[in-house]
Amino acid sequence: MKLQKPKGTQDILPGDAAKWQYVESVARDTFSQYNYGEIRTPMFEHYEVISRSVGDTTDIVTKEMYDFYDKGDRHITLRPEGTAPVVRSYVENKLFAPEVQKPVKLYYIGSMFRYERPQAGRLREFHQIGVECFGAANPATDVETIAMAYHLFEKLGIKDVTLHLNSLGSPESRAAYRQALIDYLTPMRDQLSKDSQRRLDENPLRVLDSKEKEDKLAVEKAPSILDYLDEESQAHFEAVKDMLEALNIPYVIDTNMVRGLDYYNHTIFEFITSVEGSDLTICAGGRYDSLVGYFGGPETPGFGFGLGLERLLMVIEKQGITLPIETEMDVYLAVLGDGANSKALELVQAIRRQGFTAERDYLGRKIKAQFKSADTFKAKLVMTLGESEVEAGKAVIKNNRSRQEVEVSFEDMMTNFANISEQLLS
């Protein structure tokens, strides 16, 4: 049997990993500017953490969960999304306590797992960056969080991003709209896809989210949830729109957007961009004011978003964005003969300890092959070290581009490589 990675997973090799690290670094820096701290939760949770919060009737729970019973007969699932585990942690670790500064702002970066058909930008193991803010019902929190995602896209150079916005209102507003939608869709039930016929019974708002052609036709003239918002929900949504306009963040109202998770209320949003003529959601989130209470904590407002790293990197590639990744090496040591082996290790280690990137030959290759490696690594400086150099206690270091060179003692290399580098590269 040929051993291969499981379907829907990928190996992220060093050349690509550098791009991932850059995007993650920009995200961390951006979130830090907004006073967010990192949280790390387990990759697997008790099944009920996900099923009861995300919703028993959602596609995630009914079709996509990687769940199993462990050796203690506990029902476990690999996490399919990030919000529920973070809320569980918020409650379990009593981050709602009075001594904890509010709002509590958390971000996470990690793997999620969903059993779905692999396609471009969507895998069974995928990586998500997400944020959650607890403790503020102020609509300014909604806008700040949306603005933070927008800020991140600006930093990464992503173009043609459109903010899609909607409100699900309060639970009362949502219940009134739910009934109106049932009344509208029931007469055309037979025209819906089989999935949406099931959704009509279990969670009719999800019919609006369907990608099936017949469902899209059916909901074209469906009532708008915005017509069912109560006074408080309307005021919240108007405040969100006003503040987005004050920050010069353009948006479009999308009344058919409901999000695939059951815990949202009031503001929901997606950032959508165009890739090769197709619309692609690169970030989505919203407000969830009941979820902390659902997990046994005090009633606490929450707002957050998630974005898929694979999809974000695909957009970066398709838009031709060049990430400023440092690929050059500071110095390469070409090693000639067994007599130079030990000293080469000593020198390369001393250079690294001074903060420089360095590599040496370990394979005993001919000098031409070693110089080719130096070029492949884009080494700025190259040093040749043989037995005669070891005996003399010094060696020649050259600029790999200008060919300028200087003879330097081992003592200087081991204690003052910064001056040597500056002399040759200035």
From Swiss-Prot:
Which catalytic reaction applies to this protein? Answer: tRNA(His) + L-histidine + ATP = L-histidyl-tRNA(His) + AMP + diphosphate + H(+)
Which molecular-function annotation in GO is an example for this chain? transferase activity
Could you confirm whether the keyword Signal appears in this record? no
A cellular component term from Gene Ontology for this protein is: cytoplasm
The UniProt entry, under Gene3D superfamilies, shows: Anticodon-binding domain, Bira Bifunctional Protein, Domain 2
A Gene Ontology biological process noted in the UniProt record is: histidyl-tRNA aminoacylation
Give the subcellular location: Cytoplasm
- Quaternary context: Homodimer.
Q: Which family does it belong to?
A: Belongs to the class-II aminoacyl-tRNA synthetase family.
Classification via NCBIfam families: hisS
What is the name listed in the Swiss-Prot or TrEMBL entry for this protein? Histidine--tRNA ligase
Q: From what organism does this protein derive?
A: Streptococcus pyogenes serotype M18 (strain MGAS8232)
